[in-house]
Amino acid sequence: MMTRDQFVRQISQEQAALRRFLTALCCGNSTTADDMAQDTLLKAYMQLSQYDERKRFASWLMKIAYHVFIDNWRKLKSHAEEPIASAKFIQDAQQTDNAFRYQALYLALESLSEKVRITILLHYMQGYQVKEIAEITDATESAVKKQLSRGREELKKRLKDE
């Protein structure tokens, strides 16, 4: 079983990737992403006894983050009229061009179905392989491949229109 010190070391290595993943899922809303990251870390620590050390720690952590996101999304969906993605973009004059590019990307990602968006983010932002994504999202490898293909096509179409 992983010790507390080992857990802290692993978390420090994966924290930036976890935050990037959740920020992308939250369409750039870093406040919501930070809250979800805290929830994820707390759940991971509470479930540490369930971690199988034969598997990658990062995959296990992302699976927890995925479930935290889904839980939060469902809560917000049932309580709010607008989706999570009231994305906040950088107002700095120097970064306006980048903000517009990110905004277009976030809006394109937001237009994807939840499953496809998560699959795209895990693969292209986090670098996970199809097999790992299938494990994280409780899907088959075939379904993950279809979601990646569908997501690429949708993103091409939406970003081309921009």
Give the ranges of each region predicted by the language model:
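Short, charged helix-capping/linker segments at alpha-helix termini
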Residues: 1-9, 20-39, 49-50, 141
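The N-cap/first-turn positions of alpha helices
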Residues: 115-116
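Sigma70-family region 2
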Residues: 39-56, 75-77
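Structural recognition of an alpha-helix C-terminal capping motif at a helix-to-coil junction
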Residues: 35-42, 55-67
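Arg/Lys-rich amphipathic alpha helix in sigma70-family domain 2
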Residues: 50, 63-82, 98
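A short pre-motif secondary-structure segment
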Residues: 119-123
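Acidic, proline/glycine-rich intrinsically disordered inter-domain spacer in sigma factors
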Residues: 86-110
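DNA-recognition helix of helix-turn-helix
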Residues: 137-161
